Design a protein with these regions (language model features):
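Amphipathic alpha-helical interface segments
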Residues: 1-141, 165-381, 396-503
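Long, charged low-complexity segments
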Residues: 145-152, 384-387, 391
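Substrate-binding/catalytic groove segments of enzymes
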Residues: 151-162, 391-401
């Protein structure tokens, strides 16, 4: 089996898994609605745990499936980043990353298994294996930065390059996913055993409990209808794919300029002063950092929108929409800010600080952009809803608090929200065009400064060569020193020229 066939079989297998757990989650939700907590507490509690565990499972699998199906490099990176974020949220829900944390789903499960008198040797062994796997998994965990970038973004292009652009091999992420799904499979089996045994102990059967897979939260096919309407014309899908290619290339180009600026300062021996510098190089460094961050936000929006249109089931579509609601709100918080405090530290506020006083046209453009951007963050309630969509929290009273998350999600109209995301993408296109114009304006000043730097570098190199010729007697050492000076001079000159020509 070649690589393409293997990936294809993996996609089919993952889709089957998602379809299966899609049914499991919806059935568990219906059972939760039908069962009387007072009459069958253990069965109710195990079912609630099952609902939460299966929700975490399907949430991670949906991102993994999107990563496997994606052809675009950035979309693939985005979805693997979401896999890491989903795993992080899942581990926090079932186990926690804190030491000596008692309020965990694992501890709760163990307690109700013991209290129900159904703890058998096989389950004890499974819990021991599960504990060992979780201890090993969390001890080796290093996904916090990627999780934070996925859900909250970051202001450092350096970190984005390290945590996401650096994803060139899917192998480690596939291994991470495999280890996590092994944990979730064991947990699912324990929850299902507890649920079934509790029914038996109460002389109940499956026939006494609702087993259908429709749900008032995701049961009216509104996402399928929305996707069908959006896909009637190919223009959305085609435009998204084309924009992923275009802005993906621009993002990598911007990161390349950003890294060249680093190299210039490393060779000049003043790397630490780069971020604090107010000269044209320092400003260009900061501006390319902001430019890369805006492009990164654009690519995230395009990636999750593309995944929504590719959804196969109603719950899969609903959870993909959950992600684009989270991403949309995160992007607006990051770039514009919903509150005065957020606006004061937003990317847009920083961008405005680079507008040259001598460019009135740019100031006029910025004033127009201000009104567009402020309009985009008028809905203050969205941040409260985002918080409910983002975190699945464990508590003893609500061990499977999936219904609240889905009920919040159900308040959104899919078509309306899809078009809002498209409006945001169009708004980011305007921000990017503004940045293009700003970089051109700044580049004129940078080119002049480059020429000054080039003259200084040539003068310094010439003086060093004269000193070596005069004072170094050893021919081999002299040759090595002269070669080193020439090499560094050429490197710096090439980088300085590259910084002003790469956009």
């Amino acid at each position: 089996m070649d690589k393409e066939e293997y990936i294809s079989s993996l996609i089919d297998s993952m889709q089957t898994t998602i379809d299966t757990f899609n049914k499991e989650v919806l059935i568990a939700i219906n059972r939760d609605e039908a069962m009387l907590k007072e009459k069958a507490f253990s069965a109710y509690a195990f079912n609630a745990c099952l609902m939460g565990v299966d929700f975490v499972y399907i949430n991670v699998c949906i991102s993994a499936l999107a990563a496997l199906k994606a052809d675009n490099e950035h979309a693939k990176r985005y979805h693997w980043k979401n896999v890491v974020a989903g795993i992080s949220e899942g581990i926090k829900y079932i186990y926690t990353f804190k030491e000596n944390e008692k309020k965990t789903l694992i501890r709760y499960l163990t307690t109700i298994l013991n209290d129900s008198g159904i703890m058998i040797p096989e389950i004890t062994k499974s819990l021991t294996v599960l504990q060992d796997l979780l201890d090993k998994f969390t001890a080796n965990w290093d996904g916090k930065d990627m999780r934070d970038i996925a859900l909250h973004y970051d202001k450092s292009t350096e970190k984005l390059i390290k945590e996401t652009v650096g994803i060139t091999d899917e192998g480690p992420y596939a291994t991470l996913l495999s280890d996590f799904l092994l944990i979730m499979n064991i947990l699912h089996s324990i929850c299902m055993y507890g649920f079934l045994q509790s029914l038996i102990n109460r002389n109940l059967s499956f026939n006494d409990i609702l087993q259908n897979e429709t749900s008032r939260y995701v049961g009216n096919d509104k996402h399928k209808k929305a996707i069908h309407a959006l896909l009637k014309e190919d223009k959305f899908k085609i435009a998204i794919e084309e924009n992923l290619e275009e802005y993906g290339k621009r993002f990598l180009d911007s990161c390349s300029v950003f890294e060249k600026l680093h190299k210039v300062y490393e060779l000049l021996g003043c790397e630490g002063e780069l971020k604090l510098s107010n000269n044209h190089f320092g400003k260009l460094y900061k501006l390319h950092n902001l430019y890369s961050l805006v492009l990164y936000s654009m690519l995230d929006l395009l990636s999750i929108t593309d995944s929504y249109l590719s959804s196969k089931t109603e719950l899969e579509a609903a959870l993909n929409m959950r992600y684009f609601l989270i991403v949309k709100t995160s992007v607006l918080t990051h770039i514009v800010g919903y509150t005065e405090k957020e606006a004061s530290i937003s990317l847009w506020n920083e961008i405005k600080g680079f507008i040259p006083e001598s460019d009135p046209q740019l100031h006029d453009m910025a004033a127009t952009m201000d009104s567009y951007l402020r309009e985009s963050v008028k809905d203050q309630n969205i941040k409260r809803k985002r918080a409910k969509l983002l975190h699945l929290s464990f508590s003893k009273n609500k061990p499977g608090d999936v219904k609240e998350l889905l009920s919040v999600l159900d308040t959104f109209d899919p078509l309306s929200e899809f078009y809002k995301v498209l409006d945001l993408i169009k708004l980011l296109v305007k921000v990017i065009k503004f940045l293009d114009r700003l970089i051109v304006s700044m580049d004129k000043e940078v080119t002049i400064e480059n020429l000054k730097h080039l003259d200084k570098i040539r003068s310094m190199s010439s003086s060093l060569r004269d000193m070596i010729e005069c004072y170094v007697k050893d021919k081999v050492q002299k040759e090595e020193l002269l070669t080193s000076i020439n090499d560094n001079e050429f490197k710096i000159i090439d980088l300085l020229k590259g910084v002003s020509t790469d956009k």
